Design a protein with these regions (language model features):
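Polytopic transmembrane helical bundles with strong interfacial aromatic enrichment
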Residues: 1-339
Length: 339
């Protein structure tokens, strides 16, 4: 019976990982299509019911018209145009509720059956906490764009994205821990330190990627390897308030995002070259190699995103690949630290 329950838990974790990944992808498309402010209220239970009649649609559209995004940016929007952006935000919110149900019901069942180890239970409770506040963070983010300035705060967007990727990484770590019986090796202290540095770089790359999306900083330069006519762009350090320039100067944000990407490639190459032959666990070697390959793919995709002036489909692919890098690198670190 316990073996069957263990298989069900693994399947449950895999299902959760797929849905959360889909949630992140839809969230990225919601941002890229500028659909995030189409739903101007937040209803936990009633919010899952979509508009059915024409009267429902007109009511929602009229509500949307009361806010600055319509009045300043979309004053010529038709009802059909509103429907397009509405469905993206609606789908994103419904997926959030589905994730909640898919998590909480099996979690209660498996907890009552005492199917988790003590360490697993701590991680699952952490997931419950993170998931519970993620919805509130999402609404906190949306509210930032319902004010006088009809733009979602790029800082709140980054917080929302990071929380989602941390949730996905913990799920993936638990899945690996349960399915891969041979423990991951921590070759040396330098191995741990280098991978910690790599994770920090990836963490800030994701944050600055969210800043790029939130401020449309990717559209400020559509050239590579130069940024405009220079490798180091003009106005890089031009901001009125020095402290906040690193957070809201689109030129600096774009430049720093590129520097972080180049740095991540250099460090993962060093880690792979120096440590992969010393790893006995074949799955761990594949895990490490996958990170290396994805980082290289991400660089190529990122270049095409810039050259295309942030085409929506390429931007979405860029975010999804970045999510895979984050979850693989963080789950790798968790496995060498907590196995």
């Amino acid at each position: 019976m316990q073996t069957n329950l263990s298989r069900f838990i693994n399947f449950w974790l895999f299902t959760l990982a797929i849905i959360v990944l889909l949630m992140i992808a839809v969230g990225g498309l919601t941002r890229l299509t500028e659909s995030g402010l189409s739903m101007v209220d937040w209803k936990l239970f009633m919010g899952i019911i979509p508009p059915i009649s024409q009267a429902d649609w007109i009511k929602l559209f009229e509500d949307y018209k009361q806010y600055p995004e319509y009045q300043i940016k979309n004053v010529n929007m038709t009802l059909d145009g509103f429907k397009y952006i509405f469905w993206w935000e609606y789908g994103h919110r419904v997926l959030g509720r589905i994730i909640g149900l898919v998590f909480i019901i099996p979690f209660i069942f498996f907890s009552l059956k005492k199917s988790f180890t003590k360490s697993e239970y701590i991680f699952f409770v952490t997931l419950l906490f993170l998931g519970s506040i993620q919805g509130l963070i999402g609404w906190w983010m949306v509210k930032s764009g319902l004010d006088i300035n009809p733009y979602v705060s790029h800082i709140r967007l980054a917080v929302h994205l990071i929380f989602a990727q941390i949730i996905l990484s913990i799920i993936f770590y638990l899945l690996i821990k349960r399915m891969v019986k041979k423990k991951y090796q921590s070759i040396s202290l330098s191995h741990k330190i280098l991978f910690l540095v790599f994770n920090i770089i990836i963490f800030f790359t994701v944050i600055y990627g969210a800043f790029m999306a939130g401020l449309d900083a990717g559209q400020s330069f559509n050239t590579w390897p130069k940024m405009g006519d220079n490798f180091v762009p003009e106005n890089l350090f031009f901001w009125e308030e020095k402290l906040f320039g690193i957070l809201d100067n689109s030129v600096f944000i774009h430049f720093f995002h590129r520097i972080l990407a180049y740095s991540s490639i250099g460090i993962i190459f060093v880690i792979y070259i120096f440590y992969q032959k010393r790893i006995d666990n074949s799955f761990q070697r594949i895990h490490l190699f996958s990170i290396l390959v994805l980082v290289l793919i991400q660089l190529i995709v990122g270049i095409f995103v810039v050259l295309s002036n942030v085409q929506v489909s390429l931007g979405s692919i860029h975010q999804v690949v970045g999510t895979f890098i984050f979850l693989l690198s963080s789950s790798y670190s968790l496995n060498i630290l907590f196995r």
